[in-house]
Amino acid sequence: MLDSIPLFPGLPGGPELLIVLLIVVLLFGANKLPQLARSSGQAMGEFRRGREEIEEELKKGAEGGDDEGENGDEAEADDADATETEAESR
C-alpha cells in the first residue's frame, strides 16, 4: 500500500509553475521582479565563488599534506613558552 504512494511526486508542471509565478508577482509586485532576479543572481554567483575558493583550499591542503598543521602547532607552543617567560620576568 505505502509503496504506491510517491513521497516526492516530481518537478512541478506548467499549471503549478504559473500559480507560483502569480504568487511571486502578487507578493513582490511586477516592478520589483527584475531587481529581485538580479540580486538573487548576484547571491548565487558569490556563493559559487566561495564554494570554488573552499574547494581550491581543500585541494591545496590535500596536496600539501599535514606538514602545515604540525608546524603551526609548534609555532603555537613556542608562542605559549614566550608568553610564560615574559610573565615570569615581571
Swiss-Prot record:
Main location: membrane
Keywords, in A-Z order: Cell membrane, Cytoplasm, Membrane, Protein transport, Translocation, Transmembrane, Transmembrane helix, Transport
Intracellular or extracellular location(s): Cell membrane; Cytoplasm
GO terms for MF: protein transmembrane transporter activity
Biased amino acid composition, Acidic residues: 64-90
Disordered: region residues: 39-90
Biased composition (Basic and acidic residues): 46-63
GO biological process, one term: protein transport by the Tat complex
Superkingdom to which the source organism belongs: Archaea
Pfam families: TatA_B_E (PF02416)
Transmembrane segments: 8-28
Subunit description: Forms a complex with TatC. Cytoplasmic and membrane-bound TatA form high-molecular-weight complexes.
Family stated for the protein in its record: Belongs to the TatA/E family.
Name of the protein described by the UniProt record: Sec-independent protein translocase protein TatAo
This protein's encoding gene: tatAo
